[in-house]
Amino acid sequence: MNFLKKSLFLVLFLGFVSISFCDEEKRQDDDEGNEREEKKEIQEDGNQEERRDKPPAWVPGK
């Protein structure tokens, strides 16, 4: 019976450690994804400002 308790404790402990590592990696991946999205938004905002600064193109017939 004591052997079964130790085995069960070991399995649960290793499972907990495994889940902890997975959660940590997931958080890191999410952080990297958020940084990429922020960079894209900054670039898009910069492109919109450049478009506002340029006069509209000349269109013949107007």
Curated annotation (Swiss-Prot):
The keyword Secreted applies. Residues 1-22 form the signal peptide. Expressed by the skin glands. GO terms for cellular component: extracellular region. Its main location: secreted. Transmembrane segments: none annotated. It is found in: Secreted. The keyword tRNA-binding does not apply. Residues 36-55 have a biased composition (Basic and acidic residues). The modification Hydroxyproline is found at residue 56. Keywords: Amidation, Amphibian defense peptide, Hydroxylation, Secreted, Signal. GO terms for biological process: defense response. Residues 25-62 are annotated as: Disordered. Residues 23-53 form a propeptide. The modification Proline amide is found at residue 60. InterPro entries: Frog_antimicrobial_propeptide. Myoactive. Has selective relaxing activity on vascular smooth muscle. Belongs to the frog skin active peptide (FSAP) family. Tryptophillin subfamily. This is Tryptophyllin-1. It comes from Agalychnis dacnicolor. The lineage of its organism: Eukaryota, Metazoa, Chordata, Craniata, Vertebrata.
